[in-house]
Regions:
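Conserved ATP-binding subdomain of kinase catalytic cores across diverse folds
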Residues: 46-304
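Short Lys/Arg-enriched alpha/beta "domain-start" segment
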Residues: 2-40
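Charged, amphipathic alpha-helical segments
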Residues: 37-49
Length: 304
């Protein structure tokens, strides 16, 4: 059962009463918050989990809307001494507690380093109702060991609905912002491929973070090996096509042969003309490899 000291219990209870009125404005400023277009009716705080050592708290906020289903967000926050920092939230003082200023913990370097150590060391933290635990997999040791020294974390800015942290191009930690009871599909696929399949053309699952209460487990985040890349396949395709069209527009059409007039469906089974293949470069080989890997992934998932 979760246990906390009496002063800490009082502080957590105070946060539970104050956060519902302080959170709406904070949430509307966050890029990962999915309810910006909806009217917030009320916020409940079902649990708060103190993350020891770094003066941080994992806050679970259930957001009720005027219309439609409620959503639950997992919000790690760290207490700071002064306002004015990015993603900060202020709770005014009362007779029992001084002013409380919190900021998004994923913007805090010390917290991010602590989170990685927590996964490596199987840390767990009790909350008001449940507990959070961090679990490494066998793959973590081959990717990074704490004895090798600290690695520098950096928060990625590209994602909208979740938040990802890169650790020295060795590891990537994805924290789920909107959470639901049960195993997150991304994590479920990673666990299945690692434990039940020989398919290895995905980032290795190095660990995960979950919340446990009387209703079971809720996925909070997953740690994976970092894969060097040049962006996603869609952007890669757009760049390749732009370069192809530019090359074609500047080329001499003489000797290119007659342009096929059939539909794309009819042409899909025909070989690509040599001139077109030369102009588009290595893209077709990359697209073919992507198709093979996608098919292999689906076969691996279907083997369950």
């Amino acid at each position: 059962m979760p246990t906390n000291s009496s002063p800490e219990k009082s502080f957590l209870a105070y946060l539970q009463t104050q956060l519902p009125s302080a959170l709406p404005q904070f949430l509307l400023q966050q890029r990962w918050f999915g309810g910006k277009a909806r009217q917030i009716q009320s916020i409940e705080i079902p649990d708060i989990v103190p993350l020891t050592t770094v003066n941080a708290y994992l806050i679970f906020a259930r957001v009720n809307y005027a219309e439609g289903p409620a959503e639950t967000y997992a919000i790690p926050m760290v207490r700071i001494s002064s306002e004015g920092q990015a993603s900060s939230l202020r709770i005014h003082p009362d007779r029992s507690f001084a002013e409380i200023i919190l900021k998004d913990a994923l913007t805090d370097q010390q917290f991010l380093a602590h989170l990685l150590d927590a996964v490596a060391n199987r840390a767990s933290w009790p909350g008001i109702k449940g507990q959070v635990r961090a679990v490494p997999t066998s793959a973590l040791e081959s990717l990074w060991r704490p004895a090798e020294g600290p690695i520098t974390p950096s928060l990625m800015n590209a994602e909208q609905s979740n938040s990802s942290v890169v650790y020295d191009k060795l590891l990537v930690l994805k924290m789920f912002r909107r959470v639901e009871a049960g195993l997150n599909p991304d994590l479920e696929i990673g666990v299945f491929l690692m434990e039940k399949s020989s398919f290895r053309n995905v980032p290795p699952l190095a660990g995960y973070i979950e919340y446990l209460d009387e209703h079971g487990a809720t996925s909070l985040g997953m740690l994976q090996g970092y894969v060097a890349n040049q962006g996603d396949a869609w952007q890669f395709t757009l760049r390749a096509l732009a370069e192809y069209y530019e090359a074609v527009s500047q080329s001499n059409a003489a000797g290119a042969g007659e342009i096929p007039r059939a539909s794309l469906v009819a042409l899909s089974g025909q070989p690509v003309p040599d001139e077109a293949r030369r102009r588009i470069g290595a893209y077709l080989d990359s697209a073919a490899l992507l198709g093979r890997r996608t098919a292999e992934l689906h076969l691996a998932l279907a083997s369950r």
